[in-house]
Amino acid sequence: MASLNDVCYEKIKNNFYYGLFGDFKLVVDKNTECFNATKLCNSGGKRFRDWTKLEKSKKLMEYYKGRRDDHRGGSNFYEVKGDNKDDEVSKTTGQYVKKELILDIASWISTEFYDKCNQIVIDFFVVEFKEKEKELTHQLSIVEENLKKLRIENENNLEEIKLKDTRIDELIYASKRQEQMLLESHNLLKSMGIEVKDIKEQNNELLNEVGELREDNNELQEQVENVQEQIQKVQVKLEISVEDRAPQPDKRGKKERFILLKRNDEHYPYYTIRAQDINAKKAVKRQQGKYEEVLILLDLVCHPNTKTFYVRIKDDLKKKGVKFNLCEIDISKSVITEKDLIEEMERINEEKRTLIIE
């Protein structure tokens, strides 16, 4: 988990450092990862003690004081005292609180900061929604296709069973007819004094054949029952997938795009753009204004997570000698061609469609 220690850039003294959080300059105690709330409020023309009087602030402090998930131990609410007339000492004096309170305090100080954080949160959940919607749509298409195959297979099995039932009925009828004829022949032969042992053996063989056909029919019926059970399971999954689907938003300008460009750049001829549609178009125009030759090699519309997608691309292609510099790419010293580069990106993009149905 990220810490305010990660935004520290200048040591004040001992374990106290200056840090930067958005547009706010912080005083951070690296030993506790807490920040100086007094100094933060003063920088925005407000007083920390006024924030502590708010009902919401009281509930927040009470909540975090009651938590026991801090691996460092000790208090996360403490005051550093000293002679504020001493310039060096006064830089670190004040009330220190947990990093979890910085969002509420900073939003109380600055409406602009609140608006910026609110937009970040909205963008995050919109992207998350689109990823889930796309995945559910893909799963639904696979489930529907499998259901269609199972139905066709079940229909074929039922047709085969009907044919065997008809054949069994014919054999049963033939057997009964044969028995009747044998009985008549037996009586005739008996009256003539002829041995009928051979005729009985032939009749037994015919009865054995009927028994084997009955066993085959039972096995087919069991197969049909198994297929019907699979169809029921798929129907349940299909109903769940349908219930989880959400409506597709209509704003194309907010949809994410991943674009691969080729430019007449001596060092990095390939360039990637990862942004919402409206910003991606602007980025392409900037490249066209900067270079004489700009060609779009690949354009993936509505990719749910271009950041994670690009990280996966870099991880795979660095192993093949491809060089990356932020959004720029060079394959001159690699083992792949331009065609390989495009195909590799398309292959990684297609992996998101893989779905396993248990």
UniProtKB/Swiss-Prot annotation:
Assigned keywords, A-Z: Coiled coil
Domain of life where this protein originates: Viruses
Coiled-coil stretches noted in the UniProt entry, renumbered to this chain: 126-245
Keyword field contains Coiled coil: yes
Span of domain KilA-N: 15-124
InterPro entries: DUF3627 (IPR022549), KilA/APSES_HTH (IPR018004), KilA_N (IPR017880)
Family membership noted in the UniProt record: Belongs to the IIV-6 006L/238R/313L/468L family.
Designated name of the protein: Putative KilA-N domain-containing protein 313L
The species this protein was found in: Invertebrate iridescent virus 6 (IIV-6)
